[in-house]
């Protein structure tokens, strides 16, 4: 994990990531989206880049450091889902393979807002599975919140919310 993370920090930002970082910086400077700057992406993209800059400063590697942190968290959720679906070896194998696959995909995949949305969706799916297994309103509420966070990066992923609700009603 450490080697993959360090290698990921050396990848240059993609052109999209340069633009998103600039917009995140503008947010930190007090500019207002859609008035002071405009892009076709939703505000979650800029907000996460602003958070990366706030945490790691204005550096070429700031977004990759923050993205790899998000990726590491989502990898834990995915490993547990793999364990539930296919056993403990699947969970352990995913933790070994995921960083190599993610970093090896290069900057046109890793760190893109599609992948960030996917990281939120993996966590949402984990909470959804827990909601189906256990009682309480916290589990589905967390799943819905994470789907909302994913939608702020990639709005089309919102189709999953009604599908997961239908699946819960079916059980």
Predicted features by range, described:
Residues 1-17:
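Transmembrane signal-anchor helices characteristic of membrane glycosylation enzymes that use polyprenol
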Residues 138-155, 160-167:
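Membrane-interface alpha helices of multi-pass inner-membrane proteins
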Residues 83, 124-142, 168-170:
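Membrane-interface transmembrane helices that cradle and orient dolichyl/undecaprenyl
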Residues 75-102, 118-119, 135-138:
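Transmembrane-helix signature of polytopic, membrane-embedded enzymes
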Residues 1, 92-103, 122, 126, ...:
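Short helix- or helix-capping micro-motifs
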Residues 109-117:
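Short acidic/glycine- and proline-prone juxtamembrane loop motifs at membrane-interface regions
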Residues 43, 47, 57-76:
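Loop-to-helix entry region of an early transmembrane alpha helix in multi-pass inner-membrane enzymes
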Residues 18-38, 43-51, 55:
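Extracytosolic helix-loop segments that constitute the early lumenal/periplasmic catalytic or substrate-binding loops
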